[in-house]
Amino acid sequence: MSDLRETRLEKAASLRKVGKDPYALNFHPTHKTAELQSDHKDLPNGQDREIKVAVAGRVLSRRVMGKLAFFTLLDESGSIQLFLEKATLEEFDTSENQVSSFKQITDFVDAGDWLGVNGILRRTDRGELSIKVHSWKILCKSLQPLPDKWHGLADIEKRYRQRYLDLVVNPDSRKTFRRRALTVSAIRRWLDERSFLEIETPVLQSAAGGADARPFITHHNTFDIPLFLRIATELHLKRLVVGGFERVYELGRIFRNEGISTRHNPEFTSVEIYQAFADYNQMMDLTEELISSVCIEICGSTKISYQDVSLDLTPPWRRVTMQELVLEATGIDFDNFDGDQEKASSEMINLGLEVPSTADSVGRLMNEAFEQKVEPNLIQPTFVIDYPIDISPLARKHRCKEDMVERFELFIAGRETANAFSELIDPIDQRERLLAQQIRKNEGDIEAHSLDEDFLNALEVGMPPTGGLGIGIDRLVMLLTDSPSIRDVIAFPLLRPDSGSQ
């Protein structure tokens, strides 16, 4: 690698000697390569089209054949062949260099370099649309060679660590992140068109609330106080509803100091949406309409394939209670235990289910049974509704079912994609539940909710009936791009430090 780098440094010096700065100030492209490929499909083989074009991009490959050379140039939209002819370049070369323009580009320009070219269009005898280059400009001399074009980046870990190389050599990665950007834009546009306002809330917070999660902790030097990176946007968005914003959302980064897996990254993106005068039934309607609309815009249909499994995101989606699903999968009816935790635990153990020490109530035990026996099998979009109150301290009590709340989670392809409530607006009930969470925290539950007095004060000012929804953007993008790991859809995921790095 050091020898190759030294050779490229020598070529950069050679470019300077012939008056070409290897690190240019600018260039003015007139077209994207995809635009040229699309607009000139009718150009016959072996013919030129006298349309002047200027294109810039990275050289992916090069072949020199005597007085001819063929480069492949990649820009953001796609690629195109460059047709370089010694006689043509000399005809348009107005410089007085002793080294010809053709020799300069074939001797001093490598795969990986950024290049700007001017010329006309030509379709080769073999049918390849090309730019017949009249003049060229080196834009950036690359000192590092590109990965082998046939094998690319075989090391998946290296793809994540050096995403810039992955994007150069892997068109699927470029497609994934383009789709991610379009998905985010589509979600915002859908919400904006329905009178939702996006309002930013603090990333640094004095109390980490809104989710069962362990926060990252930092310190503010001027105030000499600890602060937390937000684990959710929920509590501040609810304050905005209290203040009179009836439809509000925020799409942004969330931080949780937790494990890493194919489904989890400590830094991720979510959108939280709050609608006054709505309940969880209306939020289910909103969820399936939003996601199906985005799916059509990004994929062209609500019927997609994910990891060789056909998914149909056409509304309406199945709505079923957690209790019904657990009964169906295990034969255990948690409605029959009447709070008897020991009996519920015993039945789970008899079925071979794990019973962690944190599952210290019938509701928590039912949730454990759900996660172990039901969740992985929820492939088609399914709203799982009516959750135990024990695990839902911010959701409103169910209008009919004791010890339950009006909450749903959306599952697609065996994983949670969204979470929503009829929001708890009773300040007395909310205080009691957060105090219970505080007791759990004091007993060592590091993921229990914090007591946020300012949030409770806001509820006492008065919050209208509200439906709230959170959607994991990364997991949604995984579905829309057929990506098996969350690290495939996050441009720069958090990785363990490379022991070989300097």
Swiss-Prot record:
Cytoplasm among keywords: yes
One GO molecular-function entry: tRNA binding
Domain of life according to the entry: Bacteria
Localization, UniProt: Cytoplasm
One of the GO BP terms on file: lysyl-tRNA aminoacylation
Cofactor requirement: Mg(2+)
Keywords: Aminoacyl-tRNA synthetase, ATP-binding, Cytoplasm, Ligase, Magnesium, Metal-binding, Nucleotide-binding, Protein biosynthesis
Reaction(s) this enzyme catalyzes, per UniProt: tRNA(Lys) + L-lysine + ATP = L-lysyl-tRNA(Lys) + AMP + diphosphate
Cross-referenced InterPro entries: Aa-tRNA-synt_II, aa-tRNA-synth_II, aa-tRNA-synth_II/BPL/LPL, Lys-tRNA-ligase_II, Lys-tRNA-ligase_II_N, Lys-tRNA-synth_II_C, NA-bd_OB-fold, NA-bd_OB_tRNA
Subunit structure: Homodimer.
PANTHER family cross-referenced by the UniProt entry: LYSINE--TRNA LIGASE, CHLOROPLASTIC_MITOCHONDRIAL, LYSYL-TRNA SYNTHETASE
Protein name per Swiss-Prot or TrEMBL: Lysine--tRNA ligase
Source species: Prochlorococcus marinus (strain SARG / CCMP1375 / SS120)
Lineage of source species: Bacteria, Bacillati, Cyanobacteriota, Cyanophyceae, Synechococcales
